[in-house]
Amino acid sequence: MPHFRLLAMTLLVSLTVVGCAGSQSSTTTSRQPNVVFVLTDDQRWDAISISGHAGPLETPNIDRLGHEGVYFPNAFATTALCSPSRASILTGQYAHAHGVTDNFTEFPADTATWPLVLQQHGYETAYVGKYHMGENNDEPRPGFDYFATHRGQGQYFDTEWRINGGERAVIPGYYTTIVTDLADRWIRGRSAERPWAIMVGHKAPHSFYFPEEKYKDRFSDVQIPYPASAFMLDDKPDWYRDRLPTWHGIYGPLFDYRKQFPDRTPAGVTAFEEMVRSYWRTILSVDDSVGRLYHTLEEIGQLDNTVFIFTSDHGILNGEHGMIDKRTAHEESIRTPLVVRYPGLTAPNAPRVVDRMVLTTDFAPSIVDIAGIEPVAGFKHGRSWKSLAQGQAAADWRTSYVYLYNYERQFPYTPNVRALRQDRYKYIRYPNHTPEHKSELYDLQDDPNELVNLIDEPRQRARVAEMHGELDRELKALGAWPDVMPLDEGIGQELPDAAIR
């Protein structure tokens, strides 16, 4: 351990020297803008206080980006799973197109990404934090001049890091603080004469939730009721109930509060409350991180010449619909927080809310557009939201989007999901029409918590047929896999099978 600590300190000291050597004036230049892209893991759309739905959770630094920029309340993941979503953010493609369809598949090195395109157009680029495409691969990836990451998920304390393919070493401390230190030092080392872009990949708020020491008791006096949908499963597909005692169900072993159904015992409620509190606590540290990077940009005179993006790969179900997971097409799973600060989009004293649907696949075309680079053909499933963020009308903007998830043998608790989400209605279907895989229809305006499945309502038959047909047409246009692929082998065990990762 002393060897690793010495190496870790050497790495951090060397970064500090680079940062000092690259100090610059506080004058913002007129060149292409820098990019700071902060990506959290499993953070729900309502887990930032600017959403108005965060309860006692306050995120003033994240909110500030929206209050001085653009807030997108209707941002969505095309696949609510870590690796596929991260690949979609980089490539502007759905998972079946870029090939990363689970959490153990390597990202294809020959696929264009927005960092690679920026690098090819003169940007200096960096990735710091959780990359999570390739379970045990921490080698540098194409498109990044500087690459600091680790294998797999990393851990909240004392993660083993690898910088630019060098020797692995534990950097002692809390993950969110360390990743911010690394990002801060790299940013301070950049020249004011050359544009740069950095992605900052947080572990938080991914489970298991281990908060920073200073926040470990926050929210302890907050009572948190079970979500209204936790026990309202009668009109849902059978697989909802089948997964209750599994790794991704509220009575499974993941958070160790398996009781009778429904469980309203004091022990069960306390365990649920503490899970949600700890989830929020990890986000407090992320908010601190955003504040640090904001002030760094101020100090080096690059705040107003930087596109500062904050988002997540997808959301998470914290007990809703009886689930502790993402993957599904529920709002808590597919909606993401998204705020963007850049005066080239809107002045800091004239913030804007853009209600249109934007997707993870829109990041790649949007960022290259803002950088003044020609559109990239490979970013084929997304659209630039630059004009929307600037307040321009877009009559032809999407009014619906397709959500896709593909069954995983490693985590066999969710079937293939194909869904069409419109502004008001959502239609979800599974591989077949047995009770186990019963389809779903929700009125998001009257029933935002998706409590009442309207699929069997006679008055909704025409709507179901219409949305079913639209989903078919969109899936064909995307070149997506058939509903029955990959083959669904069903729920075979309550714990994931590590042997087939």
List each model region and its residues:
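Bacterial N-terminal signal peptides that target proteins for export
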Residues: 1-9
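Bacterial N-terminal signal peptides
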Residues: 8-19
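Formylglycine-dependent sulfatase
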Residues: 20-439, 448-469, 473-476, 483-485, ...
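Residues forming the ATP-binding cleft of Hanks-type serine/threonine protein kinase domains
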Residues: 445
